[in-house]
Amino acid sequence: PSFAPDGSRIVFNSDRGGAPQLYVMNSDGSNQQRVSFGQGRYTTPVWSPRGDLIAYTRIAGDFRVGTMRPDGSGERLLTDSWQAEAPSWAPNGRVIQFFRTAKGSGKTSIWQVDLTGANERKLPTPVDGSDPAWGPVFP
């Protein structure tokens, strides 16, 4: 689960309807609403720093990172390759990092993509990397 930046809502995934899908509810647990309706399973939801988008992993034969608005509209897949998962927002809300598992080898690496789905690139790390997370930004 992930809290909206203002703390008023929570996004989470649940398999209550069969395959895991995304739901948004008020922080007190009321007003639970399903917001994902695509094919496959939806996991690892996380609110953007501005609260205007939710990033997630969609699993439908492959793993892809996407975004949607909190009401479920505007769904957009940002990656189109083998096993991209576990999105993490940059503090400015313009870039998403994720990890990818290489087909065949099982090696993992950190990647990032901007919100247009362009400018996808592998980030250099000395060893395999997974589950990226951003630290606080200090002036």
Predicted regions and their residues:
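Sequence signature of WD/YWTD-type beta-propeller architectures
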Residues: 1-139
